[in-house]
């Protein structure tokens, strides 16, 4: 079945949705064409003339041309924003339309009165909606009668097994975009307090984003060692995870819950390396762990402090949780 995937999030663009869509496309068994902006790269990509696809007449003509040239049978919108503008406009093409909804991108739209009606009407026009977490699925069930299918998310299983030395310092890591909602500053502050209280800890940070200068300045005045990493080469992320003892990314919801963590692929990446994972209290993040067995939920600086202190004082638990990751690698994704 030939599928047209419409997306503004694709390689080489960075971010959780881009990573998810590229991985999803790589594992899609039937034929597909990726309609993406003019900067997108890939063997199945047909580039728009635009840097961003939102539903203009030009975009409709380009989509119509792709459908006719490649005998497209179904359309898959890879995200809800701004693809919801396209749904009703594409109805005249007579093809079934599906959509992947990841998380907060739809919740924010649905809170804006001027576009809320258009958005909900678009959802009703879809054949099915796929989502990555139970949390997002429940949110969607409140606003549409279209069938919601949990598609989940996943990462490649990793055979790496870390050797543990209980006498060494604890190396904590966070991998994320540098934005306020990810609360990386909480992690820096918590490890500073731990170091001041006599716990030998190091923080490794992998990522990019608008708060980079702020986070580096905060790190400069912190007592613990802080190292920043970037994806200079294809092995950078692999090396980053292999150096860690513990992973934390305390994502927090904003705007009274309208902006939240849909799931969090970085949690699954860390788990694939056998790392205990401290997840935030936002959205579907908690679905990536078995609380108390493969990680914990942390919703404040104090909780981050307490959780890291626990693993520092009980380093044998790091190995125990790692073995659980190895024995239960697919639960639930």
Residue ranges and their predicted role:
Residues 267, 271-272, 276-279, 289:
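Short hydrophobic beta-strand element within catalytic cores of glycosyltransferases
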Residues 6, 164-182, 188-192, 204:
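Conserved donor-binding/catalytic core segment of Leloir-type glycosyltransferases
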Residues 77-83, 101:
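Short His-centered aromatic/hydrophobic patch
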Residues 242-260, 275:
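Acidic donor-binding loop of glycosyltransferase active sites
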Residues 213-238, 246:
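Nucleotide-activated donor-binding/catalytic signature segment of Leloir-type glycosyltransferases, i.e.
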